From Swiss-Prot:
SUPFAM superfamilies hit by this protein: L21p-like
Function: This protein binds to 23S rRNA in the presence of protein L20.
GO cellular component: cytoplasm; ribonucleoprotein complex; ribosome
GO biological process: translation
Recorded name of the encoding gene: rplU
Tagged with keyword Ribonucleoprotein: yes
Name under which the protein is recorded: Large ribosomal subunit protein bL21
Similarity remark: Belongs to the bacterial ribosomal protein bL21 family.
Hydrolase is among the record's keywords: no
Positions of the UniProt region annotated as Disordered: 104-132
InterPro entries xref list: bL21-like, bL21-like_sf, Ribosomal_bL21
Superkingdom to which the source organism belongs: Bacteria
Gene Ontology molecular function: rRNA binding; structural constituent of ribosome
Keyword annotations of the record: Ribonucleoprotein, Ribosomal protein, RNA-binding, rRNA-binding
Amino acid sequence: MFAVIKTGGRQYRVVPDDVLEIGKIAGDVGTIIQLGEVLMLGGDTPVLGLPTVAGATVAAEVLQHKRGPKVISFKKRRRKNSKRKRGYRDEITVLRITEILADGKAPSIGPRPPREKKPVVETSAEADDAAA
């Protein structure tokens, strides 16, 4: 089963366990969010929404928030000694699609426990520097 969802003005075709990079949305890392604008459900019997499918949502887990690649906008006017350079980086949220839900069902998968960070082990060179 697949779904076509709309978020941030763009449309995505998703199946469970897909990983998406979309424009930044609210939600802490590890939480499950629901994307409600489902335009189409596909599978054995496809359902088209007018404009959205009633009662259908897509559950997704927030994997991380990050910044996209730098985009540079450079404009130059020849022979005028005039140029303008600007750059920006988009804020991105990385999602993993967990479930495609129809008929107003609630997601069955809860949020995953946060990852434990590995303890930092001091090397002998760092310990010698600290002792000196």
